[in-house]
Amino acid sequence: MKRNWKTLRDVLEAVEEDRIDAAIAAAEEKDRLAESAGEKSHHEDEFFGHMLLAVDAGLVEGFDVVTVPPSEWGYRAGYVRLTMSGHDLLDSLRSEKGFKKALALASSAAVPLTVDLVKEALKQAVGMVRL
């Protein structure tokens, strides 16, 4: 799986808005519709994969992703919430100007786009810090 910043933003928004179950159901439905049309789809895999990344990065707490080979997903949830870092990253990803700045910085420096770069680019975009 490749990291997809839009999917990560969707995951963080689902947590913030307390609609994890609805987001998972929507991903499952997209997969069902694609399969019924004879197409291959990985929406559920992508959503859970990015939820796992968010948990691993300390952006989300109270959510455990469970995998059952070959590709069955499940989860255990307690009090699911964004951490302060999760809120900060979500704010950065919502800022079109800041996110475009981060992409430009990463591209010009030939470095991968990281969480820290996204946050710093947002600060620069709003004039808080000069890079």
Regions found by a protein language model. Name each.
Residues V15-R19, A54, G58, L90-L93, ...:
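Generic structural signal for hydrophobic core residues of well-folded globular domains
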Residues W5-R9, D45-F48, V80, M84:
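Non-catalytic, well-ordered alpha-helical scaffold segments
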Residues E46-V60:
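Basic amphipathic alpha-helical segments that dock to polyanions
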Residues V65-S92:
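Accessory beta->alpha helical hairpin/"wing" motif in late/C-terminal subdomains of nucleic-acid enzymes
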Residues D91-L131:
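Exposed, interaction-prone assembly regions rather than primary DNA-binding/catalytic cores
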Residues K2-E39:
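Short amphipathic alpha-helical interface segments
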Residues E28-L33, V65-S71, A104-S107:
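Short linear capping/connector segments at secondary-structure termini
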